[in-house]
Amino acid sequence: MDQRILNVELRSKTGKGISRQLRRSESIPGVVYGKGIESVSVSLKTKELSNAIAGEGGRNHILTLKGGGSLDGQMVIVADLLQDSLKGLPLHVDLHKINLADKIKVKVKVNLVGTAAGVKEGGLLDFAMHEIEIECLPSHIPEHLDVDVTSLTLGHSIHIGDLKELPGIKVLGDPKASIISVLGRAKEEAAPVAEA
């Protein structure tokens, strides 16, 4: 996963009024926290954050902070992003300080590869788990996890435990949890027989 720059400004004032003021000036409030540092309130440009987390890896991009005094040069990932439910615009961001030598837990998107055999037979794809939690070094975070569904037949599922092991990546979660299934098509009811 590539590293990106994110400009931040330290802020001493907090609260709803300050947050509204920041949003009117196309900025958002945020907080940086993590091992070895106290939580620090920051502000950053909305568009810059959107650009930094755009693309395939989304929130899992490693971001290097600039302009934040003691935070300058710190590496973070987006731990939480509060967005406007109607407009989708960021309202607040939590940035988690990381160390490239320490493993972290993140959620990555599931990317389906191929067309399931059961779908070709008329079944319906039930995509139950769009993201999977993994644990790895920050430099090993994949943009997504590929799940090959070509051999998936009617009435069968692919579970977390069925995933191929990837070097340096531990897949977390219940091994029996279903990621994707092919559901059988509904049986057509027989037409009622007309009485003579």
From Swiss-Prot:
InterPro entries: Rbsml_bL25/Gln-tRNA_synth_N (IPR020056), Ribosomal_bL25/Gln-tRNA_synth (IPR011035), Ribosomal_bL25_b-dom (IPR020057), Ribosomal_bL25_C (IPR037121), Ribosomal_bL25_long (IPR001021), Ribosomal_L25_dom (IPR029751), Ribosomal_uL5_bac-type (IPR020930). Keywords: Ribonucleoprotein, Ribosomal protein, RNA-binding, rRNA-binding. Part of the 50S ribosomal subunit; part of the 5S rRNA/L5/L18/L25 subcomplex. Contacts the 5S rRNA. Binds to the 5S rRNA independently of L5 and L18. Belongs to the bacterial ribosomal protein bL25 family. CTC subfamily. The keyword DNA repair does not apply. Gene3D superfamilies: Ribosomal protein L25, beta domain, Ribosomal Protein L25, Chain P. SUPFAM superfamilies: Ribosomal protein L25-like (SSF50715). GO terms for cellular component: cytosolic large ribosomal subunit. This is Large ribosomal subunit protein bL25. The gene is rplY. GO terms for biological process: translation. This is one of the proteins that binds to the 5S RNA in the ribosome where it forms part of the central protuberance. PANTHER family: RIBOSOMAL PROTEIN L25/GLN-TRNA SYNTHETASE, ANTI-CODON-BINDING DOMAIN-CONTAINING PROTEIN (PTHR33284), RIBOSOMAL PROTEIN L25_GLN-TRNA SYNTHETASE, ANTI-CODON-BINDING DOMAIN-CONTAINING PROTEIN (PTHR33284:SF1). GO terms for molecular function: 5S rRNA binding; structural constituent of ribosome.
